[in-house]
Design a protein with these regions (language model features):
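Electrostatic cytochrome c docking/interface patches
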Residues: 12-36, 147-177
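Gly/Gly-Pro-rich "capping" loops immediately C-terminal to redox-active cysteine motifs
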Residues: 33, 47-85, 97-110, 135-148, ...
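Detector for the c-type heme attachment site
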Residues: 43-49, 88-89, 102, 106, ...
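C-terminal capping alpha-helices of c-type cytochrome domains
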Residues: 1-3, 79-92, 105-131
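Inter-heme linker and motif-flanking segments adjacent to c-type heme-binding CXXCH motifs
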Residues: 49, 91-96, 123-132, 168-174
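N-terminal type II signal-anchor transmembrane helix
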Residues: 1-11
Length: 177
């Protein structure tokens, strides 16, 4: 069981990642901030420097990573393609699946929306805060192997070849609302 879950966590994926345009204008960064504040701060914290989000002596101890460019953060290490790979495909730059990160929820984002999110993440000030690695305990590993937590190996839950939606122009319309 330990070996099975360890193999799940260490399995690597080679997914072709399509480059997208990352804007730098203040309006795009502001839109990205809105997305990030509504989607990411629950686990990564209000300042996005990461925080403890699960601490159960039977299951696991898990920290969401620091997304800023500070020491211990991903922001200084991730390229634009790394951000796309992580957010849209649930895959770390080294090819391993992200664990728990709900990337499957971002597969419906347009390239423009994802670009805005990445633009905002790249604009963050650095916060020096390294987070410990996740620890899955025996009961947690049993539940992971049984699928009790759903698709925590995000790379296996995502249709990586799916068409991405087009951007809906803001304005009064049936599509926009």
């Amino acid at each position: 069981l330990y070996a099975k879950t360890t193999l799940q966590f260490r399995k690597t994926y080679k997914i072709p990642v399509k480059a997208i345009s990352i804007p730098t204008n203040p309006e795009a960064i502001a839109r990205g901030k809105q997305w990030v504040e509504s989607q990411c701060t629950h686990c990564h914290g209000l300042d996005l420097s990461g925080e403890l989000f699960l601490d159960d002596p039977a299951l696991a101890t898990m920290y969401a990573p620091n997304l800023t460019p500070g020491e211990g953060g991903t922001g200084a290490k991730f390229t634009d393609l790394d951000w796309v790979r992580a957010l849209r495909h649930g895959i770390h730059p080294d090819g391993r699946s992200l664990v728990i990160m709900p990337s499957v929820e971002y597969t419906h984002f347009s390239d423009a929306d994802l670009g805005d999110i990445i633009a905002y993440l790249k604009s963050l000030p650095g916060i020096n805060k390294a987070q410990p690695k996740a620890i899955f305990r025996p009961v947690g590993r049993i539940l992971v192997a049984a699928g009790a937590f759903g698709p925590i190996i995000q790379a296996e839950a995502i249709d990586h070849a799916a068409e991405r939606p087009t951007t809906i122009l803001a304005g009064v319309s049936l599509e926009y609302g």
